[in-house]
Structure formats: structure tokens, C-alpha cells
């Protein structure tokens, strides 16, 4: 595996964050102090211009960029590179006053007023024109600056717009998709139900809250269109920058598992994947390990969208945030641990929002490296500076990747369809939580799965895990069959193969699209359990597992039964099966079982695939990065006491000590062991 460092001009892992000097232009002393403190903290980059439009262009056609060039000059002179954002994430008041069509319309048909952010219409020609104008001026002033490292498109894309422009684009999108044949759309959406048949594409409206939202196909296509329209807007910014500065890479910052956009679609247009990580550490509903593991799922998801290339941790909070229900401070050591987790999972950067806390407005209490106190002797500043010194030791890690031969399917189409389906129990569907739960169980065994969409190349892997594969896209059934027939190990669960890409139920039995043959079973019924209901599955080896929420009743064909229900009318019926198919095996878990009961099954699957596991102490997380013959093992202790890990050999890059057999990990500490 060849190393592919994102920024070879930077030593170690890049260290930086959002910097907002436009808030301090009246305080040159603070701007000067910022440079001094950045160097002390080991900063090698700064993200500028995310919300600077009103300073760039305070009145229409009046531009001011000298201050920006001055800041970039000073940063570069002090060894700090610039990631420069296009300013489209928030608009100046003059734009909304003169061009109200740039404001979004909500799902009740009400147009927004000026304010907050992310409420611009992506279809608006005038908005696109004004963004291009200010970006053109920006490029002409600093596009050739030697310190310019990367373009950061807008900020945290999200939301949707129901204005007439977007409605018309939606109709055009549907007409193109269904070959301008309204009868095809009517069939795909099953509109004869409730007499909702359309005569023309002009009759179709998006799913307004006070309108039509009862058609599953409509709701899903609106979600897909929102991604299409957002991506089209993003591409308008990207294409302009690629024309003007072709050598500068481009990213935009994603938001963990945000439900409003299909990041797999957007990722195809970007050079590098980046995201903003704000895990709710120290909450009262899960262990610290669980919080870290859920965060690792998001990291794995981000890295998997650009296989073979590191991703970027674009934002994180060294102290706390100000928008969660409870904004608890990270305890000493946690910030460094979560930052090194990002590196362990494949990031080549550690970056923050924000460098310095502002004096007012919405994020004045959001965590920052420099607090309102403004000094370098706070706990958080000292922790950030110590981390900066550690990141300098990881030059060899930069550009390596996380090798994985196992993948979990996580797909926005499935998520949207499951969340919108009218059935089961709305409060216990938990598609995202189920995917994360499977990831956590493998992570406990020292196995770090990739997180991929259903469109990804399955042949890269030896094991595919497909939780709640409710919607089967065109061709996926055939691809999964080919994967198993060729020797792959496939694991699926209840609610697999119920509907096609239009949300129409398959006929002839679930799972559809040929998957019943692959798994050797047919699901005849699915039982939804009340929160107080349980069942029990008895496995062949005598162990038992508790069933909650959902239990399918199976008709077994060619599959072998590994576990059976013990109560209710489906007692002794199959609950867990395996089917030999070609050179591989297809496992089916028909009920929502506790993960402890499934662990032996997972170990069996991994053993068949030749994927090694580790016996890790509870609370210790493991990851691996490799490239060009070098291998780095990451061990993270999320527990509040000392842990030891056996079988570790190499050099710990953080303390330069040789490890020969037993690794000792202090509370909330990490070790990065290079194999010698």
C-alpha cells in the first residue's frame, strides 16, 4: 500500500482550526497575539473565511480583501498554512433585502426571513451568481498565495427548500428519471392507492407538511432530489475553483451521520473528505467507550468514502460545545484521546472550531483553544499544545490508510425508507443505532470495519455485514449473490429485502431480488414487540440470547438452523440460520438479539474469512494504519484506570519507548506502536 499524505509540506499530522480574525480587526494586538499563541500550540494550519462574506462585501459590489491577505501573509511567514472557505455558508443582510428569492421556503410553504445561517435556496440563480462574484474576487486576491493549502466549500451543507424554483426543479428531476412518462411514476409510487394518481408532472408537489406526504416513493425521491440539488449547487462552486486554481484540493465539511443528505453522492465531487466531530462525551446514558466507539463509526464512514486516501477531522471541540442538550466539559485527557482516535481511524489532520472564543453572538460560549481569558496557561490550551507536540511525532503515520477486509453497509436510501415506512414501531426502528451496534461489537474484537454504501465495490472485502437491508437497490441482489458465490461471508438481519428502490414491496417472499435463494430462507411474518416483551433464542451450543423489538417468522429452505425461538407461537422456529451458497456462506439473523449472544457467531464468520481478532481489555479501543511496509498499531484507553494489553511489540511513538510484549496504558491515554 502506497502512502498518500494529504499535505506532504506539513510535518507530522496537521494541527489547526477555524480562525475568525474578521471579528478582531479592531484589535491588532489580539491578531498579533494569535500568531504567537498558534506557534506555542503547534498549529500548522488555520481555516479562514467561513463566515466572512459581510466583511468581504459589506455592500453589493464593494469588496475588501486586504485584511485577508495580510492575515494569510503573517500566518505563512510563521509556518502556518491556510485552508480558505468560500463564504456561501452565511449571507450579508443586503443580499436578502435586495434578493429575497435567495431565502428558503420551509415545508409549510413559508419563506424565511434574514438570519441565522444555512437558509439560502440552492436553486436560486441570483444566489449562485452572487456567490460566484465574491468567490471570483477572493480568488483574484489570494488564489495564488503560497500559503493557500485547500479550498473549503461553504460550510456544513444541510436543509431543504420548498420554494417555486425548487419545486420546478423537482418536477424536472422526476420527469428525467421517469422518461417523461407519468404512468411510470404512478406505477413506481403506487398512486392508485387513495386515488392519488397524477395526470402530469406539473401536478406533483414536494411533501409539504400540510400537503401530500403519504406516498413513500414521493418522500424518498424528495430526499434524493434534495441531495441532487445540493450537490449540483456544490459542483457550481467546485467547477469554478477547479478552473481558476486547478492545483488546490477541494473539500467541504460533513456532519457525522446527518440525515438530510446522502454524503455518498456528494463525496464523489470532492478531492478529500472532511467532517466535524462533536461526540457527547461523559453523557449519562452510555459508557465512555460506547461514545468513543460510536465516534469511530463516523470516522470509519468518512474514510470509506475515499478508500486509499486519508480524511480530515475538520472541526472538533477541545473543551465543550454550546448547542447540545447538556454541554459538558471534556475531562482532562479526553481531548487528546479523541484527537488521536481520529488519526487512528485514518485522519491526517486534527482541527478545531474554534481558535479563539468570540465576545458575542450565538457561539460565544462554544469551546475554543483560546478562551475569553486570552492566555496560554489554561488547562485546555496546555492540553492542545501538548497534543501539538505529539502530532509532530507522527510524520510516518501521515498518508497511511486503515486496511480492512470487512465492511458494514450503511446507506441513506435504506435509512430514509426505514424511517418513513408505515409499519413496525416508529420508536424502535433504530436503523442507524443498529448499524453502529454491529460496528461496536466488531471493534470490541479489535476489528475495524469500513462503512460503505450499497453502491460500493463489494469485492474489496471478505465479509459484508448488512443490518436491516430493507431497501434493495437495482442490481444489489445480484451483486450480493455474486459476492457470496465467490467465497464471501454475508451477514444480514431481519427486515432484509422488503422493497425495491421505489419502495415497492417485492413479490414472492422476503428477502426479495433473489436473496431468498442466497440465504436459503423466506420471511413469512415479522412480529413487533412492545418494550416489555421479550423472547429467547436458544443456540445449538446451549447459549441463549434475548430478543427485543422485532422477530421474523422464517420458512427454512436450504439453510441450516443455528438458533431457534423458545416461546410464543413461533417457538422452535428458526431465528438464526446459515446457508452455504457457492463458495461462501450467507448468515441470517431474524430477530433483534443482544450482541453478547451474537459474538460467537461473529467470531466464526471472521475465522472463516481469515480476519484476525484481538483479546482486548474492556474499555480499550484498537485501530491499525499501514502503508509502504510500515504498520502502526493504535491503542486507546477510554477507561478510568490503568490497562495492560498483551502481545504488543514495537516502538511507542508518543514516548519513544520500546514495547516488548506488554503495553501499559494510563487512564485516558493512547499509545501508537510502530512495528519494527
Residue ranges and their predicted role:
Residues 24-40, 132-137, 255-265, 331-339:
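Short, acidic/polar
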Residues 15-25, 51-66, 113-132, 154-161, ...:
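The substrate-binding groove and active-site-proximal loops of carbohydrate-active enzymes
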Residues 1-45, 58, 73, 397:
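N-terminal carbohydrate-binding accessory modules
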Residues 17, 38, 46, 75, ...:
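Conserved, mostly hydrophobic/aromatic
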Residues 109-297:
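Polysaccharide-binding and catalytic clefts of secreted carbohydrate-active enzymes
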Residues 32-40, 47-110, 139, 237-244, ...:
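Aromatic-lined substrate-binding rim segments of carbohydrate-active enzymes
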Residues 201-204, 235, 247, 267, ...:
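Carbohydrate-binding surfaces of carbohydrate-active enzymes
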Residues 11-15, 42-44, 76-82, 144-149, ...:
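Short, well-ordered coil/turn segments that N-cap beta-strands
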Amino acid at each position: 500500500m502506497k502512502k498518500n499524505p494529504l499535505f506532504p509540506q506539513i510535518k507530522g499530522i496537521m494541527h489547526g482550526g477555524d480562525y475568525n480574525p474578521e471579528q478582531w480587526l479592531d484589535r491588532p494586538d489580539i491578531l498579533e497575539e494569535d500568531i504567537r499563541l498558534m506557534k506555542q500550540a503547534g498549529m500548522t494550519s488555520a481555516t479562514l473565511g467561513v463566515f466572512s462574506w459581510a466583511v468581504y462585501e459589506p455592500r453589493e459590489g464593494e469588496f475588501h480583501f486586504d485584511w485577508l491577505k495580510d492575515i494569510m501573509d503573517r500566518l505563512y511567514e510563521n509556518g502556518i498554512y491556510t485552508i480558505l472557505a468560500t463564504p456561501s455558508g452565511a449571507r450579508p443582510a443586503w443580499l436578502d433585502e435586495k434578493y429575497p428569492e435567495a431565502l428558503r421556503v420551509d415545508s409549510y410553504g413559508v419563506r424565511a426571513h434574514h438570519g441565522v445561517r444555512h437558509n439560502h435556496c440552492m436553486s436560486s440563480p441570483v444566489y449562485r451568481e452572487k456567490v460566484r462574484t465574491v468567490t471570483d474576487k477572493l480568488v483574484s486576491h489570494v488564489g495564488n498565495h503560497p500559503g493557500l493549502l485547500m479550498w473549503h466549500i461553504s460550510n456544513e451543507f444541510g436543509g431543504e427548500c420548498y420554494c417555486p424554483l425548487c419545486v420546478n426543479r423537482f418536477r424536472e428531476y422526476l420527469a428525467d428519471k421517469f422518461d417523461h412518462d407519468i404512468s411510470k411514476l404512478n406505477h413506481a409510487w403506487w398512486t392508485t392507492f387513495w386515488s392519488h394518481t397524477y395526470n402530469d408532472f406539473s401536478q406533483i408537489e414536494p411533501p409539504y407538511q400540510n400537503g401530500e406526504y403519504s406516498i413513500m416513493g414521493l418522500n424518498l425521491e424528495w430526499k434524493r432530489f434534495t441531495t441532487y440539488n445540493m450537490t449540483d449547487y456544490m459542483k457550481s462552486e467546485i467547477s469554478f475553483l477547479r478552473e481558476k486554481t486547478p492545483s488546490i484540493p477541494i473539500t467541504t465539511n460533513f456532519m457525522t451521520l446527518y440525515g438530510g443528505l446522502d454524503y455518498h453522492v456528494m463525496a464523489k465531487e470532492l478531492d478529500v473528505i472532511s467532517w466535524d466531530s462533536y461526540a457527547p462525551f461523559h453523557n449519562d446514558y452510555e459508557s465512555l467507550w460506547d461514545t468513543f466507539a460510536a465516534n469511530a463509526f463516523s470516522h470509519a464512514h468518512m474514510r470509506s468514502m475515499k478508500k486509499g486516501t486519508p480524511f480530515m477531522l475538520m472541526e472538533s471541540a477541545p473543551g465543550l460545545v454550546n448547542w447540545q442538550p447538556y454541554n459538558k466539559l471534556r475531562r482532562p485527557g479526553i481531548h487528546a484521546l479523541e484527537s488521536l482516535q481520529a488519526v487512528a481511524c485514518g485522519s491526517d489532520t486534527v482541527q478545531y472550531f474554534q481558535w479563539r472564543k468570540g465576545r458575542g453572538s450565538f457561539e460565544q460560549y462554544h469551546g475554543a483553544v483560546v478562551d475569553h481569558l486570552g492566555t496560554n496557561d489554561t488547562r485546555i490550551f496546555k492540553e492542545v499544545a501538548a497534543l501539538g507536540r505529539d502530532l509532530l511525532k507522527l510524520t510516518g503515520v501521515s498518508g497511511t490508510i486503515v486496511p480492512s477486509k470487512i465492511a458494514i453497509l450503511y446507506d441513506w436510501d435504506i435509512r430514509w425508507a426505514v424511517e418513513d415506512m408505515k409499519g413496525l414501531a416508529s420508536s424502535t426502528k433504530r436503523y442507524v443505532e443498529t448499524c453502529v451496534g454491529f460496528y461496536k461489537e466488531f471493534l470490541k474484537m479489535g476489528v475495524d470495519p469500513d462503512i460503505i454504501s450499497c453502491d460500493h465495490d463489494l469485492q474489496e472485502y471478505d465479509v459484508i455485514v448488512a443490518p436491516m437491508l430493507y431497501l434493495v437497490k437495482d442490481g444489489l441482489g445480484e451483486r450480493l449473490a455474486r459476492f457470496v458465490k465467490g467465497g464471501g461471508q454475508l451477514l444480514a438481519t431481519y427486515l432484509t429485502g422488503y422493497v425495491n428502490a421505489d419502495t415497492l414491496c417485492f413479490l414472492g417472499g422476503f428477502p426479495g431480488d433473489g436473496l431468498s435463494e442466497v440465504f436459503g430462507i423466506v420471511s413469512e411474518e415479522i412480529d413487533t414487540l412492545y418494550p416489555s416483551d421479550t423472547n429467547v433464542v436458544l443456540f445449538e451450543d446451549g447459549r441463549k440470547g434475548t430478543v427485543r423489538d422485532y422477530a421474523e417468522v422464517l420458512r427454512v429452505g436450504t439453510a441450516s438452523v443455528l438458533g431457534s425461538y423458545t416461546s410464543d407461537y413461533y417457538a422452535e422456529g428458526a431465528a438464526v440460520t446459515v446457508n452455504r451458497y457457492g463458495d461462501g456462506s450467507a448468515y441470517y439473523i431474524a430477530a433483534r438479539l443482544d450482541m453478547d449472544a451474537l459474538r460467537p457467531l461473529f467470531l466464526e464468520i471472521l475465522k472463516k474469512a481469515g480476519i484476525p481478532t484481538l483479546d482486548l481489555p474492556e474499555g480499550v479501543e484498537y485501530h491499525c494504519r499501514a502503508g509502504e511496509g510500515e504498520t502502526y498499531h493504535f491503542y486507546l484507553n477510554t477507561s478510568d484506570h490503568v490497562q495492560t494489553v498483551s502481545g504488543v511489540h514495537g516502538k511507542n511513538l508518543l514516548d519513544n519507548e520500546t514495547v516488548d510484549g506488554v503495553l501499559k496504558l494510563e487512564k485516558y491515554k493512547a499509545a501508537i506502536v510502530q512495528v519494527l
